Curated annotation (Swiss-Prot):
The keyword rRNA-binding applies. InterPro entries: Ribosomal_bS18, Ribosomal_bS18_CS, Ribosomal_bS18_sf. It comes from Prochlorococcus marinus (strain MIT 9301). One of its GO terms (cellular component) is cytosolic small ribosomal subunit. This is Small ribosomal subunit protein bS18. Belongs to the bacterial ribosomal protein bS18 family. HAMAP family: Ribosomal_bS18 (MF_00270). GO terms for molecular function: small ribosomal subunit rRNA binding; structural constituent of ribosome.
Length: 73
């Protein structure tokens, strides 16, 4: 697909690096302006990293480090 809608990014997370729910600046790179978690095809993460990222974002939302939705977006 030469005219793909999704452009793959180079992941800022190296394989083996932990994804921490307290690292809000890193997590913000993987959510949209509306607060949705970006899919793996856009983030360029491995499947394990994507699962860890999803868990970290959900934990950060529970402890109010990230919003569940962003009404300004």
């Amino acid at each position: 697909m030469p005219n793909s809608i999704f452009k793959k990014q180079l992941s800022p997370i190296k394989p083996g690096d932990p994804i921490d729910y307290k690292d809000v600046e890193l997590l913000k790179k993987f959510i949209t302006e509306r607060g949705k978690i970006l899919p793996r095809r856009m983030t360029g993460l491995t499947s394990k990293q994507q699962r860890d990222l999803t868990l970290a974002v959900k934990r950060a939302r529970i402890v109010a480090l990230l919003p569940f939705v962003n009404p300004e977006g």
